[in-house]
Amino acid sequence: MKTFVAKPETVKRDWYIVDAEGKTLGRIATEIAARLRGKHKAEYTPHVDTGDYIIVVNAEKVHVTGKKFTDKMYHAHSGFPGGIKSISFDKLIQRKPEMVIEAAVKGMLPKGPLGRAMFRKLKVYAGAEHAHAAQQPQVLDI
């Protein structure tokens, strides 16, 4: 019996919607990352993008434990000397709430072209409205 290897053109991708309201950031991010990779499917193949599309709504209402709301920092560097910029979680959740979930999930995906392709299937929205009603997403309870 030969080992099954999924082909990119034969992979069936579904659309799922996740409500992040009141959910813990890390717990929701791990499940989203696993779904984006396709690890929940029987035809999972490590070098093929077999994951589904994930829509996350209410990103502004995500929850963190402990003192992370004030103490957690996000860093970015411009590439120039002294070009590091830091922003705390509470300021980032006010300014760009989508970025909080995107950063958490992106760190859990593979680095490289395959990981970037998986990350493109993640759609995050700050409020309850999203632009993917035509795809008829199924509710994913995490």
From Swiss-Prot:
GO terms for biological process: negative regulation of translation; translation. Gene3D superfamilies: Ribosomal protein L13. InterPro entries: Ribosomal_uL13, Ribosomal_uL13_bac-type, Ribosomal_uL13_CS, Ribosomal_uL13_sf. Keywords: Ribonucleoprotein, Ribosomal protein. GO terms for molecular function: mRNA binding; structural constituent of ribosome. One of its GO terms (cellular component) is cytosolic large ribosomal subunit. It holds the Pfam family Ribosomal_L13. Disulfide bonds: none annotated. It comes from the Bacteria. Transmembrane segments: none annotated. Part of the 50S ribosomal subunit. Belongs to the universal ribosomal protein uL13 family. This protein is one of the early assembly proteins of the 50S ribosomal subunit, although it is not seen to bind rRNA by itself. It is important during the early stages of 50S assembly. PANTHER family: LARGE RIBOSOMAL SUBUNIT PROTEIN UL13M, RIBOSOMAL PROTEIN L13. This is Large ribosomal subunit protein uL13. It comes from Aeromonas hydrophila subsp. hydrophila (strain ATCC 7966 / DSM 30187 / BCRC 13018 / CCUG 14551 / JCM 1027 / KCTC 2358 / NCIMB 9240 / NCTC 8049). The lineage of its organism: Bacteria, Pseudomonadati, Pseudomonadota, Gammaproteobacteria, Aeromonadales.
